[in-house]
Amino acid sequence: MSASSITKPSSPLYLITHEFYPVSGGIATFAEEIAKASAGLGYDVEVWAQSAPPEREKKWPFRMRRLPLKGTQDLTCQIRLARELIACRRQLRHATVYIPEPGPMLTMMFLQFFRAFRPKRLILTFHGTEILSFSSSPLRRWLAGRLIRHASRVSTLTTYTQELLLERFPHAADKIFLTPGALRTDFAVVPPRADRAKDKIVVLTVGRLHPRKGQLITLKALQMLPGAVKGRIEYWIVGGRNWGNYEEKLREQAGSDPALNVRFFGNIPDEELAHVYDRSDIFALTSVSHGTSVEGFGLVYLEAAAHALPIIAHNIGGVSEAVRDGETGLLVTPDRPAELAAAFEKLFHDGALRRRLGEAGRAFAARNCWEENASTLFASANDQA
């Protein structure tokens, strides 16, 4: 489905999220870009987000309300958000409430039983993992299903997550839309990459340090390469928010093979990350399923593609909608380390293929825009294509 015309509501639009700047990640980026695009289209936008240090706050084109919560999905955050919503129930009752991620959805699952708290329009966006989580038990499935029934619209970023949502919650069929990921609006226009002789080929991974992101899988695949190849590769790992002792495992594995140079950068601000992309030759993010967590899309693939980096990734979840196999990158079936190593070796030896995939990726990354997504989400319910 798509919205072909826009009827802006006279009532305000409240975007409520636990993940917003200065938090990094795909969901935080999605929420920020939808808020900015909606304000640019003339909507009266107010964002409710997790607490943040005042010195980190930006100047936004919409009203910002920081809530007294950390932004996790634990019980304390749920209770604090519920109190805020109940206290403002009268103003929310006549407004459009947009929830782009699972944290506030959990709170809404319980508040939906109170007739006094029913927003005029409720709009939800699903990314993938929460669909599996919400359908993991009969109670959660019932609560989530009831919330979806109350929603005016729901959206997903990919066809994969749309099909997953409809499989678990088929009653969403008459209200579901696609709102695909796009490049950040503050993303610098990247000039074409100049050919340059290099002694080293840099493989880059950007993502939080978590088993689902597959840094350890990529590292082990690179360590499988022949010595002559391995000695000319550097593996750069960008990301923080360590999960358990995962970083320790990564560093231990990196130290087991001194022939491969591995660098850990930690978190890097967006304005500095662009320079890291430009110094790299191949982007790798070999995500895997981890419990009920799945890669629904991956905005970081678009950013890498915009820097004309060929991509190596696992063919899992919605990744194939962010990386076109053989066109913008190479997709490998998970749990096939030899095939993954072969993909790296292929790109290492074939500079022409790296350039072709990278240039195709530049065009592919620019195909979607946030304004179209905002129009799709918030157009009048009577406007359908």
Feature-to-residue mapping (PLM):
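Glycosyltransferase donor-sugar binding loop
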Residues: 51-53, 234-249
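Acidic donor-binding loop of glycosyltransferase active sites
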Residues: 278-293, 309
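Nucleotide-activated donor-binding/catalytic signature segment of Leloir-type glycosyltransferases, i.e.
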Residues: 239, 247-272
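Carbohydrate-associated surface elements
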Residues: 160, 182
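Conserved donor-binding/catalytic core segment of Leloir-type glycosyltransferases
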Residues: 155, 195-213, 219-223, 236
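Conserved acidic donor-binding segment of nucleotide-sugar-dependent glycosyltransferases
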Residues: 324-326, 330-337, 346-352
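Short His-centered aromatic/hydrophobic patch
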Residues: 99-105, 126
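Short hydrophobic beta-strand element within catalytic cores of glycosyltransferases
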Residues: 301, 306, 310-313, 323
